[in-house]
């Protein structure tokens, strides 16, 4: 139906007859001439229709051109010629196609929005097929496609095996809720959609495949936001007979190559490394954005003898923290803006936010100054590096909570004061805690997942020091986004059972839920480790969008709906009966 793509018609084709197919981007009838911007996935070319006096065929052609509306689907035959007025905004702007034939392949109904408009997100998702026609959306989808193609080429060339793992599998506790699928042939029993291929890829290492990868679809029934979807795609990888640095060095080289190939970005020749403890101390986050130069400063030693009880209580608590954040130029903040920062911190658990503001002339404005002697106050300002024109925020309380809300303030200040440097800042965060204490459940939970190996090999040591145990987990962070997470796995069945026990999973429950894994580890499991990268998140970073929905062809809303297909939707009673499911009416 076509000889060339619209966006690739250029000067080399001048004088030649071409056949094009695409959508009517714009049609303009200027009376004596019609101009049609014809669009396909490669771009736009101008089609010109010039009626010839006394020529019935050209008059009919002009009539067809004059009748065209937005998004009508056309096949156009014509001769390429040089344009009198060059359009530098188009790749095809030096040429035009003089139409000799136009066939309307399909008429478009009146549009809810035009391809060059940017309507509300609900409208975009309801008419996703129209949204995806927009040049910006085409660009972002192509970025994703190039990313996946480049990853496959890179791994295939290095002897990784692309192996599929089951979509219908066993429900296992991995942090989020499972999506459940009733098993028709086994009444009362259910499959689960995988939250990740974690256990299958470990079993593939036991099976001797050595190097595995998969572009895997994963499913988690959890609350949605701009960087999270119910179903998502990850690059899943696993290596046999490796230590942490073996995995990290390989995927670091891979990321450098992929970013160069896909978006022509040169990532750092060596990614910096930081322990989890250092990241939390300096940045209040386990995924710090290193483009923002601001850092948290611990001030507990300077305030533990002050007369401000909020500070002294936290400073004298072994699990407490008093941290400061200096914002250069922050003295311009009004009282209302300071209250806005306090409200932002409250979203992350802050019960209050103290501050010291220094005017350009050195005048102090602070609700906490009265609690310090002149010498102690001066020492505090010196310790945090405060100068004229700055504001310093202070947070006090439990260590983790203070780190969280002060880290959130750091990000807010970085963006609002234009302190985010241009470029790309990759980072390895290592040595994560093995466990964290869940106050509500009154038990330990795994910070990564239950299959991450501890840094110690001795089970007695792990049991005795579970609260402070460090794991062999690691994350790759880019511009404040965790783009990959991995670890060295537990390969000994006795260690895996001990970790289950520490997580409150007894022997009987472990056997019921993970018996297949424990059995596999008993038959000569090699030391192994791996990592998984979020394809959606990396594609969004490469495409320059904050929402992963922009790089997913058919995403869900934050309300977990597909507006285009109207999913989820009710199921007929006979279908439910086939899978032995009854729906209870919603309790009011």
UniProtKB/Swiss-Prot annotation:
Binding site for L-aspartate: 174, 220, 448, 489
KW Nucleotide-binding (keyword) present: yes
Name of the top EC class for this enzyme: ligase
An example Gene Ontology CC term for this record: cytoplasm
Entries under CDD domains matching the protein: AspRS_core, EcAspRS_like_N
Record-annotated membrane-spanning stretches: none
InterPro entries in alphabetical order: Aa-tRNA-synt_II, aa-tRNA-synth_II, aa-tRNA-synth_II/BPL/LPL, Asp-tRNA-ligase_1, Asp-tRNA-ligase_1_N, Asp/Asn-tRNA-synth_IIb, AspRS_core, GAD-like_sf
Keywords, sorted A to Z: Aminoacyl-tRNA synthetase, ATP-binding, Cytoplasm, Ligase, Nucleotide-binding, Protein biosynthesis
Enzyme Commission (EC) number: 6.1.1.12
Function: Catalyzes the attachment of L-aspartate to tRNA(Asp) in a two-step reaction: L-aspartate is first activated by ATP to form Asp-AMP and then transferred to the acceptor end of tRNA(Asp).
Name of the protein: Aspartate--tRNA ligase
Gene: aspS
């Amino acid at each position: 139906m076509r000889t060339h793509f619209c966006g690739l018609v250029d000067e080399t084709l001048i004088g030649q007859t071409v056949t094009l197919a695409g959508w009517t981007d714009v049609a303009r009838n200027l009376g004596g001439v019609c101009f049609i911007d014809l669009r396909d996935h490669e771009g736009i070319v101008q089609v010109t229709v010039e009626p010839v006096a006394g020529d019935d065929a050209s008059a009919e052609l002009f009539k067809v051109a004059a009748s065209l509306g937005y998004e009508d689907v056309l096949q156009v035959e014509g001769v390429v010629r040089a344009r009198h007025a060059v359009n530098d905004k188009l790749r095809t702007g030096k040429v035009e196609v003089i139409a000799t034939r136009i066939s309307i392949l399909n008429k478009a109904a009146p549009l809810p929005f035009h391809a060059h408009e940017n309507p509300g997100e609900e409208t975009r998702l309801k008419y996703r097929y129209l949204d995806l026609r927009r040049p910006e959306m085409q660009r972002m989808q192509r970025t994703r496609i190039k990313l996946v193609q480049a990853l496959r080429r890179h791994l295939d060339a290095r002897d990784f095996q692309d192996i599929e793992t089951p979509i219908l599998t066993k429900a296992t506790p991995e942090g989020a809720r499972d999506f459940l699928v009733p098993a028709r042939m086994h009444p009362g029993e259910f499959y689960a959609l995988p939250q990740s291929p974690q256990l299958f890829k470990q079993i593939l290492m036991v099976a001797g495949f050595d190097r595995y990868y998969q572009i895997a679809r994963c499913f988690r029934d959890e609350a949605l936001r701009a960087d999270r979807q119910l179903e998502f795609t990850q690059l899943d990888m696993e290596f046999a007979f490796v230590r942490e640095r073996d995995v990290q060095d390989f995927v670091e080289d891979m990321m450098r190559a992929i970013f160069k190939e896909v978006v022509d970005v040169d990532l750092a020749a060596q990614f910096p490394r930081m322990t989890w403890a250092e990241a939390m101390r300096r940045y209040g986050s386990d995924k710090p954005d290193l483009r923002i130069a601001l850092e948290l400063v611990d001030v507990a030693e300077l305030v533990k003898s002050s007369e401000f009880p909020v500070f002294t209580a936290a400073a004298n608590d072994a699990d407490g923290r008093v941290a400061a954040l200096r914002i250069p130029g922050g003295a311009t903040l009004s009282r209302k803006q300071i209250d806005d920062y306090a409200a932002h911190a409250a979203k992350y658990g802050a019960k209050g936010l103290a501050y010291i503001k220094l005017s350009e002339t050195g005048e102090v404005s602070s609700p906490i100054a009265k609690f310090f002697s002149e010498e102690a106050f001066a020492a505090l300002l010196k310790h945090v590096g405060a100068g004229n024109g700055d504001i310093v925020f202070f947070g006090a309380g439990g260590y983790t909570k203070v780190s969280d809300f002060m880290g959130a303030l750091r990000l807010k200040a970085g963006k609002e004061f234009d302190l985010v440097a241009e470029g790309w800042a990759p980072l390895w965060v290592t040595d994560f805690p093995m466990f964290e204490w869940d106050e509500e459940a009154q038990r330990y939970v795994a910070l990564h997942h239950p299959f991450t190996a501890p840094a110690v090999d001795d089970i007695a040591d792990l049991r005795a020091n579970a609260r402070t145990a460090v794991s062999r987990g690691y994350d790759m962070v880019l511009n404040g986004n965790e783009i990959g997470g991995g670890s060295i796995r537990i390969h000994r069945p006795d260690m895996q059972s001990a970790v289950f026990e520490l997580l409150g999973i007894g022997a009987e429950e472990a056997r019921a839920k993970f018996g297949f894994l424990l059995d596999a580890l008993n038959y000569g499991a090699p030391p192994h480790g791996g990592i998984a990268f979020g394809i959606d998140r990396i594609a969004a970073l490469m495409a320059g969008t904050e929402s992963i929905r922009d790089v997913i062809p058919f995403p869900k809303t934050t309300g977990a709906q597909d507006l285009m297909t109207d999913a989820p939707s009710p199921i007929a009673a006979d279908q439910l009966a086939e899978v032995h499911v009854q729906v209870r009416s919603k309790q009011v």
